[in-house]
Amino acid sequence: MKVYNTLTNKKEEFLTLVPGEVKMYVCGPTVYNFFHIGNARTFVVFDTIRRYLEYRGYKVKFIQNFTDIDDKMIKRANEEGSTVKELGDRFIKEYYKDADDLNIERATKNPRATEFMEEIIKFVSDLIEKGYAYEIDGDVYFSTKKFNSYGKLSGQNLEELQLGARINIDERKKDPMDFAIWKSQKPGEPAWESPWGMGRPGWHIECSCMAYNLLGETIDIHAGGSDLSFPHHENEIAQSEARTGKQFAKYWLHSAFVNVNNQKMSKSLNNFFTAREILEKYDADVLRMFMLSGHYRTQINFSMELLDSTKAALDRLYNSINNLENLLDEVKNEELRDEELEYKNELQKYKEKYIEKMDDDFNTADAISVIFDLIRDVNTNVTIESSKELVKYTLDLIRELGNPLGILQESTKASLEEEIEKLIEERQKARKEKNWALADKIRDNLKERGIVLEDTPQGVRWKQI
């Protein structure tokens, strides 16, 4: 298996610190709002990578944090008249709802920065003691010049950065590029006791501390959105390696941006979408498949038209699954026949091709193409004459390959029944309101899909024809 390591800017053989085990840390959300589709792509991508590593037999310890103390959180809490803790509690709950709806597996642990205050203070103290940090008026700064390899992740040149940083310079700092790892309390802000007075941690130190305490001095994978590469991840490396003297993470993985209608997503352009807004209109499978239809290191363009195209493609896959589920009930031959054994073995080539694509830096776009090729083959060769064993095998294989991507796991029968019952309720409501046109439209639309409604004294019944 090969992964693209941002640290070296090349694909490398994936060799974990402990064979068969992966220690993985992903930067999670700052919990002051609902997460948007750009965040959603990051969460879906690294959920998929985690799932695939598990599919390949690795035991993955997956940590994704919540930043629950931060300038944005303080500002939002003040605006709405709540405490930072109340705000964090609320949006952590909302995060879980949206992540569950998006079929994102729960992390091994989701630590909150505020749970690690004692450990963060110890981390800062160690950096001061080792000469990598200094205190001024209750603020503590990390000295970037003391860390010789600063800039190695992002490829930034420290001298050039220093020139650029001389705008709005804090004269108290020894160097313009030094960054805060502990901030003294300002009026109205939450704060914790420390050797430097009341204050709170800087953002970068929070992740370094949580990764260190939950995964150890060196981890296998550190991941996040490409916008975090500098300064956040660069600063994490500096702090962590200055403290331990050891490599912080072997592999750095970064997912690319989502543009909206070929423009950068922003509230000012009125093209800002939360994941929740999209999930109200589209199933999780649609959004996941869309997010994975491009390589994770490549920017993707988001539009409702592209989502509709993804939905149409996914519907074709589910129609094939539905046909196979129906075949499973209808076929009469139970056991695999000799001539089917060869075909069953031939289908293994799709699994091998899928693994080949995913082993090449998690190429989900090509892996999805392999699933389409498999289904085209099955549509032609698995029929009413096939054995139950072969039909079941093909269904299981499709679901097996869909599982690491987090798609194609629903039973089409169960989802179809749920959808039809919902439409029947809407029709009943329309009839009660004497909206005959809408009631007839729902009935006719269902008929076009092969669903016939029967109005009986016991209620509405339906059947497929």
UniProtKB/Swiss-Prot annotation:
Cell compartment(s), UniProt: Cytoplasm
Annotated residues for binding of ATP: 267
Protein name (record): Cysteine--tRNA ligase
The reaction(s) this protein catalyses: tRNA(Cys) + L-cysteine + ATP = L-cysteinyl-tRNA(Cys) + AMP + diphosphate
Keyword Heme: no
CDD domains per the UniProt record, alphabetical: CysRS_core
Residue interval(s) of motif 'KMSKS' region: 264-268
Gene3D superfamilies in alphabetical order: Cysteine-tRNA ligase, C-terminal anti-codon recognition domain (1.20.120.1910), HUPs (3.40.50.620)
Domain of life: Bacteria
InterPro entries in alphabetical order: Cys-tRNA-ligase, Cys-tRNA-synt_Ia_DALR, Cys-tRNA/MSH_ligase, CysS_C, Rossmann-like_a/b/a_fold, tRNA-synt_1_cat_dom, tRNAsynth_Ia_anticodon-bd
GO biological process, one term: cysteinyl-tRNA aminoacylation
Motif ('HIGH' region): 29-39
Cofactor(s) demanded: Zn(2+)
GO CC, one annotated term: cytosol
EC number: 6.1.1.16
GO molecular function, one term: zinc ion binding
Protein family according to the UniProt entry: Belongs to the class-I aminoacyl-tRNA synthetase family.
Cofactor details (free text): Binds 1 zinc ion per subunit.
